[in-house]
């Protein structure tokens, strides 16, 4: 049962919500209420740090929590905040070794400082369940233990909305990527939707609702949160990026470009204040989404500008997985979406200074792009070398118990192997391999780090069937792919061709018209656009 003092604090919180602002810069981070027993003079500063944390601005959040602890050494809950921030993006994977060390130290400082209320001590104990024995217990086990601790905390203090919000985030961290009922996600969303109605300016609620709905069948439920989040916390780079998770799911490419451009600009501006030579991993993450969206609109010059900017970077401000992923994905997407097979086959890992061995799941993208480019470009020997490389990377990830990404590499290997089989005339085997890749990809979910598969396997299956003279079957696969990845340029183009070849001129014209509408701001004359114009003009 929550104490009367805690209930009183919660009541005060409902009456007086702190809108987090910074006078010097007119900072807008949203409205957060987190009552504490710390000195009243640090309360607003503490809530600002919590708001920064809810928008995944980890470095600034850590600075904020540490400043609170320095101003009020007895404020143990400030060290709790730092420990939470040192997790980094919990949806992207485990913390870095430094994050684990710093987070553990923050928990120890929280214990030493001594929180004045049972509620605050419970928060500290909850985060301690994640860091405890991190050198002996695997990440997943500790993440689940933390989720259960936050569930207990939220139940113990039913009027404490922050406890419920952090619990909802924990549910998204521990979700089963193979669960197509989306049990954890919908459970989290139910918690968050209730709070969203009460606190429509809360950054964490909108943020975590987007993550909860970031899955094809339920993505439309996230539109409201997506459109609100950037308005709630426009000073935070991640808040400007996050709406694009939903926009991408629904094929709203221009909206994705616009919100990610703002996100990247803020992230790069922040970095320029401290480091003029390194790239920002926050900006790179947004730039991957921009490039992906621009390529769907055939805005190839816009995408090329992103590629050139990435290639000019020789180091990164923080070796985060999101940065490594973007470094590998952006040039791969640029080559493959333009069907520049030779260019894809020659892609090199960049920058060389990055510790690529730490990120085999990112290196796998490079191997996939090189392999697919070589296979479809006719260099089957080179493609087979990349299949071997993908096998090694998948094995390394499986050995490290990184099952999700090991499976993604296996799917990539199957796809490249399918096109190799096609190149060698083993057409039945090619179809079997590609269907296996598509089915296995459908059985998993997109990771939050990526706007989408580098090349969707079911879309490739449709293209392969079309190439092998089976247009009706191709159309069925392409339409299924569009349900998962709507408004993809190549998906629409292939569907138009398949429908035409299958004798359905009306459907072919519909897809071709959609393609032309999609690419009306194109800055390149892709063959797909030329063909669609000719078809629509003749029909």
What are these regions (language model features)?
Residues 7-19:
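Bacterial N-terminal signal peptides
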Residues 76, 83-87, 95-115, 248, ...:
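TPR/TPR-like (Sel1-like) alpha-helical repeat modules
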Residues 412, 430-482:
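Generic long, charged, amphipathic alpha-helical segments
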